[in-house]
Amino acid sequence: MSLELIVMRHAKSSWSDPCLSDHDRPLNGRGRASAKAIGTWMKEEGYQPDQTLCSTSTRTRETLDQLELDTEPNYLEPLYHASEDRMLQLLQNRAKGKSVLMLGHNPGAAFFAQAILSKPPKSDAFSLFPTAAVLVVRFDTTNWRDLRFGQGTLAAFIVPRMLLPQT
């Protein structure tokens, strides 16, 4: 048995209310559409996580809602703007099941995605890890605690622009 990790950055958020804290910013219309499209893609491709580790921010919670996955979320305050090292630590200590979705923020999500793979995908978008980007990684291990940077094998990488019509 191998493990599967789905790393996702939250969808596009709204900056329309300057009084909101960064933590409380919601998704904008484009973000909701992008997250829905990613959720549809995940279902079509058979990516159904057993567990979700999600930042507590409003935009990550709303992104997760728009994905419409059949999984119980675990909201973790330490995932809010976590570094790649902190993300790995949370995964090693909190992940359960064969497949886990980790939903967070840049720059940590981008750095984590780059560090976890043995070989990055050939995609200009990968290094930027734009909003609602999804990386699916497989590991030849059965224990989340054994994960290390550089061990993951690319299964898929997608961004909303690959799924939605351009306007």
PLM features per residue range, with description:
Residues 120-155:
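Domain-level recognition of soluble alpha/beta enzyme cores
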Residues 97-116:
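A glycine-rich beta-strand to alpha-helix segment
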Residues 86-94:
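Short amphipathic alpha-helix with an adjacent loop that forms part of the alpha/beta core around
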Residues 5, 99-101, 134:
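Residue-level preference for the first positions of well-ordered beta-strands
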Residues 45-47, 93-98:
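Glycine-rich phosphate-binding loop signature in dinucleotide/nucleotide-binding domains
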Residues 150-167:
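Charged phosphate-binding loop/patch that engages nucleotide di/tri-phosphates or the phosphate backbone
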Residues 2-86, 121, 129-130, 164-167:
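Active-site-proximal alpha-helix that buttresses catalytic centers in soluble enzyme cores
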